Amino acid sequence: MKLDPTHDPALRSWVESANAPGCDFPIQNLPFGIFKRRGQREPARGGVAIGDQILDLAALGLRTGPTLNGLAAMGRRASRKLRRELSRMLSAKSRQIKRLQRFLVPMKQAELYLPVSIGDYSDFFTGIHHATNMGRMLRPDNPLLPNYKWVPIGYHGRGSSIVVSGTPVRRPAGQVKPPDAAAPLFTASKRLDYEAELGFVAGPGNRLGRPIPIRDALEHVFGVVLLNDWSARDVQGWEYQPLGPFLAKSFATTLSPWIVTLDALEPYRCAAFARAAGDPGPLPYLQDEDDQREGGFDIQVEMHLRSEKMKAPVRLSRGSFRDSYWTLAQMVAHQTSNGCNLQPGDLLGSGTLSGPTPDSLGSMMELTLAGKQPLELPGGEKRAFLEDGDEVIERGRCAREGYATLGFGEAAGRIMPALQK
């Protein structure tokens, strides 16, 4: 754990809303995003979230352009230096308060964008509880496939359909084969689901043909966002063999707009997942003593649901990245182990973050046992899977005694009716 004055829990900001209990964006956070003032003819540009305000980086002379890829490419040393300077500027003891007040934009007046241009997107399968739960529905006697505890499994996702929080999600159509049908049909998905995930935004990256050693892996991660990997389970069930997910996943993925840097998350590091007795140890390229000691991050992820009839969202689950079988450093090391090159702004998904308890399951597929036990919502409605008009809201939080509590904002999306019946 590498701490500095920016992590001091006693630190206060002259932006009063940043000092409020429960604030997602206290001065100890300082996440980066892309914004412009709503209704104004002006370019989108970089900003830093502080309380309920955005500090305009362009006004400070840091012109990122419409994405943060350039900042990510500079590496953690540069972003760490910038973070420390921003902390000094926004501190209650700052000598620049009067000047900086002019550079604040209220979040309510801002339009937020995807923070980076995403060239490539890989989605992993690090949540062992999710993998076991899903496998148990398909293979009750052998829920985990033999390779799971040896290799950080993943697949190549679709970058073009990644959208920022608040973007509506159209119910997809695809090939579905009902159990009693002789042939598949093309129809709107009736088993639309969410997946509670985190997304990790790549920093400088590596040259083609040059793997990133696990000991250096976190130097190539700019920060973390919330990620909802929408999934059409009925389409997925028919198409995924033998090559894995395709159209069941590629129609939409929702991200939160603020990138929380790894430096902000230092106080919430924890040990890697404790493997069961008899589990194999990681192969040498995935093994690092420091990573095993503190390569995990205790980032809590909550999923909330709001229906057209139920205006107050209800929490469906709360999981944590600390329950992932594989660490972030292992994900990066494995992704690049064959020489694959990561580029600034590339996205690595964690996979669904389910915990060991019923209230920590990160998908409706698990919560409802594939629709067999529908959820009963407070207003009396029932849900086996998502219905048109439902809004899913993902929230993230880091809390640890002796440190400030940080948030990630939201990754929200509302389901629109399918174009295909």
PLM regions and their residue ranges:
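Active-site microenvironments in enzyme catalytic cores
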Residues: 6-37, 49, 55, 59-318, ...
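Residue-level marker of beta-strand positions
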Residues: 46, 53-54, 197, 347, ...
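Conserved phosphate/anionic-ligand binding catalytic regions in large, soluble enzymes, centered on
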Residues: 120-127, 341, 346-350
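Exposed beta-sheet edge/beta-hairpin loop segments within beta-rich domains
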Residues: 186-191, 339-340, 383
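Local beta-strand/beta-hairpin segments that build beta-sheet-rich folds
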Residues: 309-320, 364, 406-410
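Active-site pocket scaffolds in enzymes
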Residues: 325-337, 344, 348-391, 395-397, ...
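Short beta-strand edge segments in extracellular beta-sheet folds
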Residues: 414-416
